[in-house]
Amino acid sequence: MARAVVHVMLRAEILDPQGQAIAGALGRLGHTGISDVRQGKRFELEIDDTVDDSELAMIAESLLANTVIEDWTITRESQ
């Protein structure tokens, strides 16, 4: 078994109000040096060797990400 990790993030040109709220809270809590925060999602899929990159891409585009406003990346982790 292996693990595929799909990271989904808002596109750079899309406003991220959650990220802005986190950045503001960090400043109020006394944390300095952080100029921006972007919030995203991480999906971990336990897969066997028959699942190839094109199938993972299809899953990411059709189910996990809203491709109008989000970008995604896939990495594989061995266990």
Curated annotation (Swiss-Prot):
Entry GO MF terms: ATP binding; phosphoribosylformylglycinamidine synthase activity
Transmembrane intervals: none
Keyword Ligase part of the UniProt annotation: yes
Tree of life domain: Bacteria
Gene Ontology biological process: 'de novo' IMP biosynthetic process
EC class: ligase
Family according to the record: Belongs to the PurS family.
Physiological role: Part of the phosphoribosylformylglycinamidine synthase complex involved in the purines biosynthetic pathway. Catalyzes the ATP-dependent conversion of formylglycinamide ribonucleotide (FGAR) and glutamine to yield formylglycinamidine ribonucleotide (FGAM) and glutamate. The FGAM synthase complex is composed of three subunits. PurQ produces an ammonia molecule by converting glutamine to glutamate. PurL transfers the ammonia molecule to FGAR to form FGAM in an ATP-dependent manner.
NCBIfam families per record: phosphoribosylformylglycinamidine synthase subunit PurS (TIGR00302), PRK05974.1 (NF004630)
Protein name per Swiss-Prot or TrEMBL: Phosphoribosylformylglycinamidine synthase subunit PurS
